[in-house]
Regions:
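N-terminal nucleotide-binding beta1-loop-alpha1 segment
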Residues: 1-19, 33, 193
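Conserved N-terminal catalytic core of the sugar/cofactor nucleotidyltransferase
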Residues: 2-5, 31-104, 170, 174-176, ...
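Active-site metal-binding loops of divalent metal-dependent hydrolases
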Residues: 10, 105-107
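Short catalytic helix/loop segments, enriched in acidic residues and glycine
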Residues: 20-35
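Alpha-helical elements of Rossmann-like donor-binding domains used by nucleotide-donor carbohydrate transfer enzymes
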Residues: 36, 40, 59, 90, ...
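Short beta-strand-to-loop element that shapes/binds the nucleotide-sugar donor at the catalytic cleft/hinge
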Residues: 55, 124-141
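Catalytic-core segments of class I nucleotidyltransferases/pyrophosphorylases
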Residues: 101, 108, 114-118, 130-131, ...
């Protein structure tokens, strides 16, 4: 199975750090966020990795080629960030037609993916307990089926999931820039084709300066 790392965003909420450094290259401890997640994938048996890049993408590419010189890591280039959905659509020519693992580059975590299914009809999401910055949650589970409540949901999407490329191949999108959560998954959630599981392991979405500081604090306490 291949894996894709989403790494093309601007990281605006992490300014001024991301003025000259793309968010995936920000460090927790001595490692960049993306370095940690590549090591996570390699540790879990993934050897074919695709990374989409755009904003300051050349810095990400140079960093990865330097840190992982012998790895089979390919890059999907975007002239401007295409969003989570558009980024995947643009990378399908590299990813192929088989189910792949999708992971955000900007999460600090210790999530166990050993018990993930081998394939999915549409998508399989890993959820975590709602953090303070997302108390409304993203989705809920009943017998491993994903559904969305009108008000508060039980889980937050961790940024790790399995994706079946068919959900992109069988749809026509008005723009090449779009969000997978808003423009792709709802249709399949309503059809009962999106499954999920809950993780109780450590997880931080490093999307703001405060949460970057928190990730470093947690890292220092663990090491």
């Amino acid at each position: 199975m291949k894996a894709m790392i989403l790494a093309a965003g601007f990281g605006k909420r992490l300014m001024p750090l991301t003025q000259d450094t793309p968010k995936p290259l920000l460090k927790v401890g001595n490692e960049s966020l993306i370095q940690r997640n590549i090591n996570f994938l390699i540790k879990n048996g993934f050897s074919d990795i695709v990374i989409n890049i755009s904003y300051l993408g050349e810095l990400i590419e140079d960093h990865i080629k330097n840190v992982f010189p012998n790895s089979n890591i390919l890059f999907s280039y975007e002239d401007h960030p295409l969003g989570t959905g558009g980024g995947i659509l643009n990378a399908l020519k590299i990813l192929g037609s088989e189910t792949f693992l999708l992971i955000n580059s900007d999460i600090y975590h210790d999530i166990d993916i050993q018990n993930l299914p081998n394939t999915t009809d549409a998508a399989h999401l890993i959820g975590v307990k709602n953090p303070s910055h997302n108390e409304q949650g993203d989705f809920s589970l009943t017998k491993n089926k994903v559904f969305i409540k009108e008000n508060t949901n039980d889980l937050t999407w961790s940024g790790i999931s399995l994706i079946n490329p068919i959900i992109f191949e069988e749809n026509i999108f008005e723009s090449n820039s779009f969000n997978i959560w808003k423009s792709v998954l709802p249709k399949y959630i309503k059809k009962g084709m999106v499954t999920g599981q809950e993780s109780h392991e450590s997880w931080i979405d490093v999307g703001t300066l405060d949460r970057l500081k928190l990730a470093n604090t947690v890292h220092n306490e663990e090491n």
